[in-house]
Amino acid sequence: MNYWLMVVIFAGVYADGTQEAYVFKDPHFHTLNECVRNANDPNEIPKYAKKLVAEYGRMMQIQKVVCASQDEVIKTFGSKYAIGDPA
């Protein structure tokens, strides 16, 4: 099964042209619409912000949040982002 994952892309660009990003493996979603709804849900956003602060020790400026298929995430960030048995 191919899941959908929420990916936070932070503002700012490193000298090599890359950007810092965070992939939420939990929760993961079964459809794109489910991911988008969750990413825009005012009741859920504080949970994601809290997780980011726990990871980075501070709130980082966010450029954008996207929902990407597990396959796209694995191609971009590597197999450590696989969830269960890939489709």
Label every model-predicted segment.
Residues 1-23:
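Short aromatic-glycine-(Arg/Gly/Cys) micro-motifs in beta-strand/loop hairpins
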Residues 15, 19, 25, 70-71, ...:
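Intrinsic disorder/low-complexity signal
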Residues 43-87:
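Short, mixed-charge low-complexity intrinsically disordered segments
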Residues 13, 34, 72-74:
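Solvent-exposed loop/turn segments at secondary-structure junctions
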Residues 5-6, 35, 65-67:
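Hydrophobic beta-strand residues in large extracellular and virion-surface proteins
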